Amino acid sequence: MTRVRRKGLAGIGLVLVGVLLTGAAQAAPAPGRAPAANTTAAAAAQVNFAPAPAWVDAQAVPLDAPVPAGGLSDGRHHLLADQQVRVAGGTQVDYRHNAVRAVNERGVEDIANVQLRFDPSYQTLTVHRIEVRRNGRVVSRVGPGALKLLQREASLESLIFDGRLTAHVALKDVRVGDVVETVHSVQGSNPVFGDKRFGSFDFDWGVPVASRHARLLWPEGRPLYWRLHNGARPATVTRAGGELDHRWRLRDVPSRVVDDNSPGWYDPYVWAEWGEFADWGAVARWAVPLYRLPEGPLPAVDAEVARIAAATSDPEQRLLAALRFVQREVRYLGIEMGANSHAPHAPSLVLERRFGDCKDKTLLSLALLRGLGIPARPALVHTGLRETTQQRLPTPWAFNHVLVQADLGGRRVWLDPTRAPQAGKGVAQWVQSDFGRALLVSPDTRELVPMAGPEARALKRELRTVLDASAGFDQPATLTVTTRAQGEAAELLRQALAT
């Protein structure tokens, strides 16, 4: 559910993360199409070969750029990272032009495999050029027949299926010193975002880049909001034809080295966010209809409500019983294709399938709590950004998780249905989720709200070691180690022992 900061150029180089695109389609005529190699013909129809759009300002590749003394990654020298985005009416196109030189054998291995990702349910990939240059001349050019479509499911190990495809090309006869140029665009809008557009531009990475060009064409008079991070300078803006042309040009961008052990909220990279959401309240209002419970009876849900209600009349015990049921009986599995990247599935379907992701489990929990008469609502959070979420531009990409905020007799409690089944006889014994700041999904929301205090985040573990040699130095001694965990530490230990 979130934009992931990357050390390399995976998001802007040879691999395009299509889920970050939020606009609608404006496709040029496509004289060539990729064949259906190992996917459906319908998906193959979403891949075109065509010239670049007329509005694109083509950038020259600095082929004479010297190889930096340090900072290269995997034998690659990134010569050009060009990204141009155009929003016009209800359409958006994201154009990329990247050029990478192989400086050694490892670099050849990497640049010879081109991967372009997109979601065929709402996006169209258009390949404009894929070429290999040697000594300044084009020695090979990729045609439609060379493209293979793969459904790799990159997040499979995390039990998430998103349905995105990878258009893959294995280039032939690539040598040390060759430059691979990839020019393509992606069109298409995830319907979950409605008519709102938002995105970002990166200006440095964990590798050096000889030339960086970023551009946003935006309709004049249409509201647009910016957030610049870590010293990013404002764009140079010109006006022409009813559009605002925002541009950045950077040369010889050095690499930025960041410790692998840095906390998840630490982001030293230079970048800019743009979008149409005026404030956090606007993001909350966007999410409200996604978590609106269906009217009328939900037989399977109502049956579970009746079971819990018959077992206890105490609101706190009802709350815990409902949450335990979702934690124990609904396993984690995310089917996040298309709009379901952010929209939950219906509670009845989740209960029938007995699996779901954080959105699905949250909506099912809300349905149970509604039936039990306990006020509750979803809360959007970011598990890594925590307090620094408030430094981001208000957009849906500021969040990557959702949980339940319930009102228990005036007490605000934060409960995560995706946790392993929790123990404890009351809320006081339960570990409440705390991710620093949360956005309550409600029409009345205006700002992010703080979650529990620092004491709730503390990992409490007591280790007691006793070496008993009282029987004498010539007798066996006894070593006893006792570990006592509390709070979050107890839940982590319990989960580890369960596996």
Predicted regions and their residues:
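Secretory-pathway-linked proteins and extracytosolic
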Residues: T40-A58, V174, Q187-F198, D202-I335, ...
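Bacterial N-terminal signal peptides
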Residues: G11-G23
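Short, solvent-exposed loop/turn segments at the edges of secondary structure
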Residues: R164, R175, V209, G241-E243, ...
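Bacterial N-terminal signal peptides that target proteins for export
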Residues: T2-G13
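Short, conserved phosphate-binding/catalytic loop or strand-edge motifs used
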Residues: A303, G338-S348, H382-E387
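Second-shell loop/turn segments in exported
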Residues: L165-A170, V305-T312, P347-F355, Q390, ...
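Lumenal/extracellular ectodomains and adaptor appendage modules
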Residues: R33, N38-H213, R247, A300, ...
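Hydrophobic/aromatic-rich core segments of domains that either
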Residues: R324, I335, K359-G453
